[in-house]
Amino acid sequence: MSQRPNTPQRDRPTEYRLSLSSNASSRRSSLGNNGRDQHASNQTMIEKYVLPQLQELSDSMVTLDGNMTHMNFIHESIADLNEALSALLYGLMCNSWCVDFPNISHDTPHELKLIQRLEELKQERQALQAKLKPKELTKGSILPLSRQPLSRGSQMLYRDENVPGSTASSNVNIDINDDEDNTAASFVSNPTTFKPQMISSVGASTDFMGKQTVGSASSKLRRRSILHQIRNNAAIGTIPNTLTGITPGERKRSLAVSAKRIPILAGSSTTAGSASSANRESTNTEPALPNRVVRTRQRTYNPKNLASRPPFR
């Protein structure tokens, strides 16, 4: 027959152990009842010192339990906020990486240095342009002596000092705009027998820019009537240097000036008579050909002498 193992002996048949889940009032009542039975002498000390402290400890544990519960709620709320806030910050960071904001300067000193350098380069460029501009003007303005323009009215004539065969005339005043300002002169005039060329020596020359100007100066002159040309060329006492090769016989007097007496030169009649006789001989006689009779032509009019002409015309 087997025997039961020995069990430890208990001092009291019933032993009360405190549990965390037990009620405080039941613990106090059980302790009080047990204390009255066993420790009657110490009842006053327990009720006076131990029980109030235990009651305070129990109340503190209840308060701690409530505080921990609230702290758990706060922790959960902070965790949720942390996740949302971290997601927001991550999104903003990704947006700043992917999108370029031109108005936000990332490196302010470097940007300021670049702006200052650009301003210095701009000022240096303006200074160089200001230095080069007078040189370009001097290159374009300096011309050879034969190509220096002479301002006469609104037109530009050139010097012919270096051109062989040309003579420079002094005190030559040609007012080309006189035809537009002066209305006192007559509008009837005898035409000339030549074509006046204002600029003949520079017809086929090279300008200072290297371009060939064949008659460019004369072609740019405004086309004028015969009256204007005669009044500007033949009615002036002095002849321009470009018209020195014209004989007085080729020029005809203009009616725009006042009436003058034509002087009868001594050799004019003799020269005219000899010229007319030579002309008659050349026209009336024809070269003799074989088997052909030479006949003389007879004129039906008598040539008049210069003395029979009126003194004015």
From Swiss-Prot:
**Cellular component terms, GO, for this chain's entry?**
cytoplasm; DASH complex; mitotic spindle polar microtubule; mitotic spindle pole body
Principal location class: nucleus
Going by the UniProt record, its keywords in alphabetical order are: Cell cycle, Cell division, Centromere, Chromosome, Chromosome partition, Coiled coil, Cytoplasm, Cytoskeleton, Kinetochore, Microtubule, Mitosis, Nucleus
> Which regions form coiled coils?
110-139
Give the InterPro entries listed for this entry. DASH_Dam1 (IPR013962)
Localization annotation: Nucleus; Cytoplasm, Cytoskeleton, Spindle; Chromosome, Centromere, Kinetochore
Example GO biological process: cell division
Is Cell cycle set as a keyword in this record? yes
Note the superkingdom of the native organism: Eukaryota
* Compositional bias annotation for Low complexity: 17-35, 268-278
**Which Pfam family, any one, appears in the UniProt record?**
DASH_Dam1
Disordered: annotated span = 1-39, 268-313
State the function annotated in the UniProt record: Component of the DASH complex that connects microtubules with kinetochores and couples microtubule depolymerisation to chromosome movement; it is involved in retrieving kinetochores to the spindle poles before their re-orientation on the spindle in early mitosis and allows microtubule depolymerization to pull chromosomes apart and resist detachment during anaphase.
What is the protein's quaternary organization? Component of the DASH complex consisting of ASK1, DAD1, DAD2, DAD3, DAD4, DAM1, DUO1, HSK3, SPC19 and SPC34, with a stoichiometry of one copy of each subunit per complex. Multiple DASH complexes oligomerize to form a ring that encircles spindle microtubules and organizes the rod-like NDC80 complexes of the outer kinetochore. DASH complex oligomerization strengthens microtubule attachments. Within the complex, DAM1 and DUO1 may form the microtubule connections. On cytoplasmic microtubules, DASH complexes appear to form patches instead of rings.
Q: Which family does it belong to?
A: Belongs to the DASH complex DAM1 family.
Protein name, UniProt field: DASH complex subunit DAM1
* Organism this protein belongs to: Kluyveromyces lactis (strain ATCC 8585 / CBS 2359 / DSM 70799 / NBRC 1267 / NRRL Y-1140 / WM37)
* Protein encoded by which gene: DAM1
